Design a protein with these regions (language model features):
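Conserved hydrophobic/aromatic packing and binding residues within compact polymer-binding modules
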Residues: 14, 28-29, 39-42, 70
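Alpha-helical residues within the helix-turn-helix
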Residues: 19, 30, 61
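Short coil turns linking two alpha-helices in DNA-binding domains
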Residues: 24, 35-37, 52, 66
Length: 75
């Protein structure tokens, strides 16, 4: 079982749920207390390291989904 995080898939899911909640990247970034540039990198799967757990927790809370939903690889 591969436990690594697919940053591209994570970013796609965050973007999907953000749009479903009718939020812009700017609004989500502000609510999570991160820069818009970093939010954009997360959604594009361009983060060099994994997204930190506190940031991921904040994103999931704002979007109203579980961290598991964001990280789950739906193969």
């Amino acid at each position: 079982m591969d436990s690594s995080v697919d940053n591209r898939l994570l970013g796609l899911k965050i973007a999907y749920f953000r749009k479903k909640n009718r939020l812009t990247q700017v609004q989500l970034a502000n609510q999570v207390h991160i820069s818009v540039r970093y939010m954009s990198k997360i959604e594009c799967g361009q983060v060099t390291n994994c997204v930190s757990l506190p940031v991921l927790h904040s994103i999931s809370k704002v979007l109203g989904v579980s961290i598991d939903t964001l990280l789950k690889n739906d193969e």
